[in-house]
């Protein structure tokens, strides 16, 4: 039996699931009657982790966004993982919308998590390691209490708890 148990808290999005969800969304858009004959484009930029939606009007962009979000939810990607960056005219009568995939635990949220854990006065140690928070304790029950505590924070991030040892 190990003396110390630990796990890591990070924010992550499975990019393959995002690709699969977007392919499914493209298929649905191509078969929907309200998009027949209209420009409706969905693109993923893996490098910048953005999704670009292009369509003929704001209402069609909203419909595209709803389709994409529903497909992401079916692929178990939470809606908090997506943030709308901007909407702009894309030449002619088209409108362009950029969505950002939030998949990093920034230092502000990492500090908030560690502060809440330390304020709770549990018998655990929390430390920030780059884009993740490592939590260690002698008791697995304490670690499970920390997981529940962090989930109850309702941060606008797709949190994942990995490497429970």
UniProtKB/Swiss-Prot annotation:
GO cellular component terms attached to this protein's record: cytosol
InterPro entries linked to this entry: DUF520 (IPR007551), UPF0234-like_C (IPR035571), UPF0234_N (IPR035570), YajQ-like_sf (IPR036183)
Signal peptide: none
Keywords: Nucleotide-binding
GO molecular function, one term: nucleotide binding
Function of the molecule: Nucleotide-binding protein.
Protein family per UniProt: Belongs to the YajQ family.
Protein name: Nucleotide-binding protein CFF8240_1664
Lineage of the species this protein comes from: Bacteria, Pseudomonadati, Campylobacterota, Epsilonproteobacteria, Campylobacterales
């Amino acid at each position: 039996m190990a003396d110390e148990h630990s796990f890591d808290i990070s924010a992550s999005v499975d990019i393959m699931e995002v690709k699969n969800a977007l392919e499914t969304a493209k298929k649905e858009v191509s078969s929907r009657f309200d998009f027949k004959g209209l420009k409706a484009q969905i693109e993923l930029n893996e490098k910048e982790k953005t999704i670009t939606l292009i369509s003929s009007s704001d209402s069609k962009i909203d419909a595209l966004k709803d389709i994409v979000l529903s497909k992401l939810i079916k692929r178990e990607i939470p809606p908090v993982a997506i943030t709308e960056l901007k909407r702009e005219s894309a030449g002619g009568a088209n409108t362009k919308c950029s969505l950002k995939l939030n998949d990093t635990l920034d230092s502000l949220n990492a500090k908030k998590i560690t502060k809440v854990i330390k304020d709770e006065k549990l018998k655990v140690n929390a430390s920030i390691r780059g884009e993740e928070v490592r939590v260690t304790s002698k008791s697995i029950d304490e670690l499970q209490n920390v997981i529940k505590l962090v989930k109850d924070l309702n941060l606008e991030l797709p949190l994942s708890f990995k490497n429970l040892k």
